[in-house]
């Protein structure tokens, strides 16, 4: 599947991929939402690792499609495979955590990952994705600038089935 790009990802200092679905280890329970509910199998983690990706963004509109348990299990599976993750958490504070990657002589990279408010957003008490909030991300970026040499902001936007812009954009 990734044979054509593997040589590129393996040469990169940091290679990032978005994981657009939760992994389902058990009978998933799709959430009520507009649009499709996606799910993946554990072999997807092996494919990402084989391809040479070492960071996975998880803040997107499908990460909660099979519920909070699958969301958190997806992060655990990726991290157990040696792939760093960013953009989700057991609550909104954890989901907003900035990922720092120290590249020794090349410096430290900070990654901020968030997404539009659809069906996947973490709350104060529930797991999910880091919501797009320009004020929160501004402060996260300012703090990251004091701790890292480079700051990368990745915003996932995918408002489905509408011709209108989301109010957050």
Question: Model-predicted segments: where are they?
Answer:
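Acidic, metal/ion-coordinating pockets
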Residues: 1-165
């Amino acid at each position: 599947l990734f044979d054509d790009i593997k040589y590129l990802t393996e040469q990169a200092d940091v290679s990032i991929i978005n994981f657009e679905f939760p992994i389902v280890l058990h009978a998933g329970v799709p959430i009520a939402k507009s649009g499709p509910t996606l799910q993946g199998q554990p072999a997807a983690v092996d494919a990402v690792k084989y391809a040479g990706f070492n960071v996975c963004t998880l803040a997107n509109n499908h990460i909660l499609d099979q519920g909070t348990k699958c969301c958190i299990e997806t992060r655990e599976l990726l991290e157990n495979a040696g792939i760093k993750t960013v953009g989700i958490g057991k609550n909104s504070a954890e989901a907003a955590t900035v990922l720092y990657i120290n590249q020794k002589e090349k410096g430290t990279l900070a990654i901020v990952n968030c997404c539009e408010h659809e069906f996947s957003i973490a709350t104060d008490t529930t797991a999910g994705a880091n919501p797009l909030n320009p004020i929160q991300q501004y402060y996260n970026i300012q703090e990251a600038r004091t701790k890292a040499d480079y700051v990368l902001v990745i915003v996932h936007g995918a408002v489905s089935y509408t011709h209108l812009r989301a109010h957050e954009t």
